[in-house]
Amino acid sequence: MKGFWRIGLTLAGAAASAAAFAALWPHARDASALLLAQDDPAQLSDIQVNSALRTNAAAIGQGAAQALADNDADLAKSFTDLAQDKGVALPSGLAARVDAAVTDENSTASTARRFATGFVTGEADDVASLSGTVAGDLFVFGDIRDVVREGKRLAMGENADQLVLGLASVGLLVTAATYVSAGGATPVRAGLSMVKDARKVGRLGAGLTEWAGRSARGVVDAPMLQQAVATASIARPGQTISAVKAAFKAEKAGALVRLAKDVGRVSEKAGTKGALDVLRIADGPKDVARAAKLAESKGSQTRALVKILGRGALLLTAGAFNLAWWVFAALLAL
């Protein structure tokens, strides 16, 4: 009799284990895929977006509609491109509305207005205004404007933005390299402009701001720069550049230049707004380097992926990592 009880308990335990295995297996499979993809941003984002779509199949369409409501045609187009890649049907008429919004945003009058704004103010949030910003920086107008403005504040003991000052100082030297290399350093130049613009409009992530601030302070001799910019002027660009060069520590600029290059890579594949989105969520230069890999793989879909997943589009976050390990370990314990 006891033997029958033991057999019954064994069978019941086996059945329970089998049921638990069946319930856990899909989650364990996803967890395993996440762990294996943690060093590949493109594959990682695919896995997580597919999971999000299983939970809410309308997420992409909702994202596109919200982007249109926010007057962000570029983001809306990113969502429709992602929908096409994933084979997701969009609500009737949504794709046509997105195309019309993109056409309007790219109109000649709108582009010219935003280019002029970027050139004069040095602030950008799209391709046209960034083109104006980069043009201003390539003609050294933009960087000298920033060096003079922030440098004067520093010289007068006011609260100067030393990050913008440091980026502008690096930019003056990179601009010279761009001319020498017949444009070869333009992606780095554009990247520096975007980091600077993101800082000005409060779209640079806290972690990246802290890192870039430390790096920027290291590339200039503050007392020498303070003395140099005390007499600097946009009207005397040659004198200003020479003064900044004297205070510049080229050997310390490598990290900022690498960051700018990665930002430029994101911009080339995902657009200016895509690069600015990345700068907002990045916790440091490694995040931006991973974003460059994501953008090179996903192109125009990058903004939608970042919007849906946040920083999770770039790396396996601590919460997701711990959950994946827990599910995987639970399966092995059966």
What are the functions of these language-model segments?
Residues M1, A33, V49, T117-V120, ...:
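N-proximal short alpha-helices
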Residues M1-G3, A101, E105-A112:
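Charged, low-complexity, helix-prone segments enriched in Lys/Glu/Asp/Gln
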Residues W25-A28, P41-L44, R114-F115:
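Short acidic/polar alpha-helix capping motifs at helix-coil junctions
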Residues L34-S107:
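Alpha-helical protein-protein interaction scaffolds
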Residues A57, A69, A73, D137, ...:
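Solvent-exposed, acidic/flexible segments
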